[in-house]
Regions:
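Conserved residues at beta->alpha junctions
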Residues: 10, 36, 90-91
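Conserved short-loop catalytic and cofactor-binding motifs
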Residues: 7, 33, 45, 84
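Non-catalytic, surface beta->alpha helical segment in thiol-disulfide oxidoreductase systems
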Residues: 61-108
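Residues that form or flank phosphate/diphosphate-binding pockets in enzymes
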Residues: 14, 40, 91
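Thioredoxin-like thiol-disulfide oxidoreductase module
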Residues: 34-52, 60-64, 98-106
Length: 108
């Protein structure tokens, strides 16, 4: 079963707030993993995304692993709104919507 994970942090940020508003609008409830309070969450995010960018959303399997290895980033490219297949970090509203549709979390 496909699951939607969202990495967050305790002090929040505008991108995290935007993602939450969009997910509320889309009536989706992700599994939130807080990198400020959950050590494993920070480690997983570093391993998968290569940085601690929040929010990062992951299309995951039952074990909460990405459904496929994230696509690599081009050298020196920021992660903001880059759809890397199974993950997207700091998405815009349109980027998040496209990611959710592609993975079947949201109807087109």
């Amino acid at each position: 079963m496909l699951r939607l994970l969202m990495f967050t942090r305790a002090d929040g940020c505008p991108d995290q707030d935007l993602a939450r508003r969009c997910l509320d609008e889309f009536e989706l409830k992700p599994i939130e993993l807080n990198i400020s309070t959950e050590h494993d969450a920070a480690r997983w995010l570093m391993e998968w995304a290569g940085c601690l960018a929040v929010p990062t959303l992951v299309a995951a399997d039952e074990r909460h692993d990405p459904i496929a290895p994230p696509l690599p980033l081009e050298p020196c490219r920021p992660v903001r709104n880059v759809d890397r297949g199974s993950i997207i970090s700091e998405p815009t509203r349109d980027g998040l919507r496209a990611f959710l549709i592609r993975h079947g979390f949201l109807a087109s």
